Swiss-Prot record:
Binds 1 FAD per subunit. InterPro entries: FAD/NAD-bd_sf, FAD/NAD-binding_dom, NADH-Q_oxidoreductase. Its cofactor is FAD. It comes from Mycobacterium tuberculosis (strain ATCC 25618 / H37Rv). Induction: A member of the dormancy regulon. Induced in response to reduced oxygen tension (hypoxia), low levels of nitric oxide (NO) and carbon monoxide (CO). It is hoped that this regulon will give insight into the latent, or dormant phase of infection. It comes from the Bacteria. This is NADH dehydrogenase-like protein Rv1812c. Pfam families: Pyr_redox_2. The keyword Oxidoreductase applies. GO terms for cellular component: extracellular region; plasma membrane.
């Protein structure tokens, strides 16, 4: 039997698998002719971009609910090796699987430098499990002795994830530490750049800065973290901040599986792909999502985001089947780019274009953000094969 293996079950991986199933259906390929298999380290599709939120109950979807109706198999295991010449992947269980075509969609991870104490005492919202660990830690602190340090959270990294996390935390902390005792919850956002939101551009920066003020979030810019301890952080300036919680949100890098391939990678560890999501220099392999640097237009590469990961997955899934059956491949181009950043109780900010010009803010932008987070980025959850395959069509959604 011919086999397509998809590594990863995030935004790109899920949609690559469903996209492949859809194209097989469209070509009327007989059942049992091509096996589409997802291999990932968990039996869930996680809505990773919501990990900063207080309520995580809707952030994890059983893969069986969305892959099963589409006839896609799933293996729960960590892929440890890719043999591109032999067309075989090996997992942490010792099992190996041959493939005729591979879609690499193993995502990215937060970069944690070898700082004293970070591995032992730091938290993150990079994964669902990490977000749950942070949530349980904060709940534990709220049930213990109430001190200023217990009610203080330091967030490191003032990019998009760091800003959303910092803006969400004041409300969570006030709810957790509501018994008072004269202790005021405190959130401090740290970044080595001279200002917060360095990637958001000049138009959005004043909106972000005002939102941080409105949320009561303190900032320390132009400094870095030198060390982390159970009681707080020491900054490069020499300042020490007493805090029982340090959340690391600084920097992302593509999955380490990309390092096993004999081709160049960009500064984020991503593979270069062509317009059809084929990995340049590696036969029979496609890549989508955070592991791939794909051209969105003549000037801009894809961004590590679900905004780009989902359509990259859909196109990769369609093209991997087209490639198997000598059908024309579809080029991916996305003619627009937006950013919708959650600012907690201060609303949100919505920007358009690669220069990130603000077009909406406050409550209207918040409504858009909530619509994205709770509806737009979800697969159909009604168990309908027809709905799942229809949603996996190789197309680019209009702006939210």
């Amino acid at each position: 039997m011919t086999r397509v293996v998809v590594i990863g079950s995030g935004f790109a991986g899920l949609w690559a698998a469903l996209g492949a199933a859809r194209r097989l259906d469209e070509l009327a390929v007989l059942a049992g002719t091509v096996d589409v298999m997802v291999v990932s380290n968990k039996p869930f599709h996680d809505i990773r971009v919501r990990n900063y939120e207080a309520d995580l109950s809707a952030c994890r979807i059983p893969l069986g609910d969305v892959l099963g109706p589409a006839g896609v198999a799933h293996v729960t295991a960590e892929v440890t090796a890719i043999d591109a010449d032999g067309r075989r992947v090996t997992t942490s269980t010792g099992a190996s699987y041959s493939y005729d075509r591979l879609v690499l969609a193993s995502g990215s991870h937060v970069v944690k430098p070898a700082l004293p104490g970070l591995a032992e005492f730091g938290f993150d919202v990079d994964t669902y499990d990490g977000a749950v660990r942070l949530q349980q830690h904060l709940q534990g602190l709220a049930g213990g002795p109430l001190t200023s340090a217990a009610a203080t959270v330091v967030v490191v990294g003032a990019g998009l994830t760091g800003i959303e996390t910092a803006c969400e935390l004041p409300g969570r902390l006030h709810a957790l530490f509501a018994r008072g005792d004269g202790v005021t919850p405190r959130v401090v956002l740290i970044d080595h750049n001279p200002f917060v939101g360095s990637d958001m551009g000049l138009s959005a920066r004043p909106v972000i800065e005002q939102a941080l003020l409105d949320n009561g979030v303190e900032t320390r810019t132009g400094v870095s973290v030198a060390a982390v301890s159970p009681g707080g952080v020491t900054l490069s300036s020499g300042e020490r901040l007493a805090a029982a919680t340090v959340v690391w949100c600084a920097g992302m890098r593509a999955s380490r599986l990309t390092e096993q391939l004999p081709v160049a990678r960009d500064r984020l560890g991503r593979l270069q792909v062509d317009d059809y999501l084929r990995v340049i220099g590696v036969p029979a392999m496609f890549a989508a999502g955070d592991v791939a640097a794909a051209r969105m237009d003549d000037e801009h590469l894809s961004v590590m985001s679900c905004q780009h990961g989902r359509p990259m997955g859909r196109y990769a899934g369609c093209n991997v089947i087209n490639d198997l059956f000598d059908q024309p491949l579809l080029a991916l181009r996305i003619p627009w780019y937006v950013t919708v950043l959650d600012l907690g109780s201060a609303g949100a900010v919505y920007t358009e274009g690669w220069e990130r010009k603000v077009v909406s803010q406050g409550a209207p932008a918040k409504t858009t953000k909530q619509s994205i987070n709770t509806r737009r980025i979800y697969p159909p959850l009604n168990g309908s094969r027809a709905d799942l395959l229809a949603a996996a069509a190789p197309r680019v959604q209009p702006r939210p």
